């Protein structure tokens, strides 16, 4: 099976939507759409006319239901009035918010072209949406659905009596299907309700069940072939009595679908799946929550949503076999009623196409659907929005034929031309009839009567809808005008054609024609009338022609109405006449109206797009602001984290209690301290050098000799000149010494600032060194004292009495100098102590005194050290891997012990895991012969 897809060019299409319902009208002229959802929910009624591919909004009387989607709609006609033109469309449930509706609304469509809303007041039940419904024996049968307000899915069957307006729950048996919503339902043989697919909030389904509406027993269907994917929101349409079409939906992987599957119902329990292939390039987009309607051999797919797109397009599907011949012929529905074609009973239509036993009685394709009638018409040029029945077209053809016959008869009677034979077909209608006398003397009166009746018929038809509106809607603008009765023939005067269409009816005087008109009119069909043959010059010829007409009428009575219409059109050559008389002004006006409508529609669409763009830009700006705030928050959080980490490191660095810390952190802290001390030492070397230079500049104590409780400088006596020079030098030294303390103080202040940055350990080391130096100096002084004592005791005898006075005076001076020096030293020691006390205040207990840059340097050095350690470890691992690979390569082909080279290796050494030794050799070894590591354990291998 193949499917030919075409996209329909629409006129005045409604807003795109999904979740709506589409109800096929019983006369096959189109379908009605109610409700749906897009940016908002709808409650309007839209009518689509298949004859001119146009949409029109229906204004109904009464209180309309509230906006909704996900509801159900069912066509119902009372069994008490099976031949009535009125019917009802019953709507139940649906939702506009999370809470679904539970009301029932009925749209009454009467034969007088009126639409009336009525809300049925019943006991409240739980509302639901996404359910399905059918009508069986004056009961509305509802199955499934969901209630988002209560987070509940249903698998119960509810019955609503259309007579008593009461709800009740039907108890069912058999294999009951699981609870679900957005499934599909269809009826077979009017007593079986099938369901397919659906969704229960967690799982998608592709199973089939049917409920016997007489026994209320569920049964699961096992179909052959490859079933469709699990889905919901699809559509199911009966295209024949034994064929079901599944289209679209949303799959289990949240992907929208546009595939088609056909379920063949071949018997009571025989079912088979088939997936046809697409033809053409206008394949419908993937969608769900759309509608499909089967009318006149075609399936109409309308609206839906999918992949973020809201759709309002319309596609038609035609079914072909492998030889590209139609499986379901395109039929023409001809309603007999004179009322609006939206109204019509399914029993009051005649199929004028190829007979199809499997086609639905409500199917219809319109005159434009037949390939042999008005093949040059284009659906995009249909501007009329009123639906048209083909009975008016047939009556227009009949009246034009009868008018032509009367005019030809009058001309032949006046000219007495017996050789002119007109093979015209006489048609009759149920409005008016005329009798022609058989005498030639009354020809003029008959002609006058015919003209009068034609004018009366014209006035009568003008009050009705234009019967030739289908022809006027086509691109060829076919129209007929029969007002000018003085013209010789419609065929000979194409210039008399205009956009005004009228019809007249005549008939010859015969008793059989009157009876046939009455009988056929009562049945509501289009009778077949025999053609008129012969001359109208005398009574005998008229009698012969009447007898021939009666015989031909009996022979052609079985012909279909479509063949008669086609023969009449061919005999009139109406295509050529209409093509010669195109009214360009009307065409231009219609084209202008069409373009104006399209421009208005595009402007509205553009405005809606601009509004959407504005909203989108506003949302984008809001999102950008939110993203910026989130980024700022993330930056703040990251900074807080870094600050907390630095605090932790700081607390670890300056924490005195390190007993609770792990060994790794202690090692890291030790490395950090060592590196910081090294850096500080490098920075403080100039200050230590300055201290050493100052200590060198301080004069050392002169070596003295204690003798008889007096101190004597170990110097040789100098001559007087030398003494004077020495005194001058001493005075200069004293001046320098007086200046030195000031310089020392200044230098000490500088050193205090510099030494304030030294660490505690370094200062302790300096103090220790100073103490050691002092001890060494004291030891040296004591040694010198001892040596001087010995020297003085040995040389005391040599000293003379003259020099004693000199030495005493000199000793006093030196003692005074020593006292002064000692006082200066004590002052210096006090200053050093004060300096040490100040240093103790500025000692580096931790790294508090370090600035930000020094901390960053320490941290970078720490990270660099970690990187170096990691690189060293990686290098070791790589070296180890290389060595292991080499060992593997060496031992790859080795099948014997490394030591004895005779036994196979069956021991694995641990921890090196070398397996190149046998058990005998391994028992004698303590180290691995390959890697020289100690053997801690051995594992034997059993082969």
Curated annotation (Swiss-Prot):
Coiled coil (UniProt feature): 593-653, 743-845, 872-896
Keyword Metal-binding on entry: yes
Keyword vocabulary terms for this entry: Coiled coil, Cytoplasm, Kelch repeat, Metal-binding, Repeat, Zinc, Zinc-finger
Pfam family, one: zf-C3HC4_3
GO cellular component: cytoplasm
Gene Ontology molecular-function annotations: zinc ion binding
InterPro entries reported in the protein's UniProt record: Beta-prop_ATRN-MKLN-like, Kelch-typ_b-propeller, Kelch_1, Znf_RING, Znf_RING/FYVE/PHD
Location in or out of the cell: Cytoplasm
Annotated protein name in UniProt: RING finger protein B
Native species: Dictyostelium discoideum
Upper taxonomic lineage: Eukaryota, Amoebozoa, Evosea, Eumycetozoa, Dictyostelia
Gene behind the chain: rngB
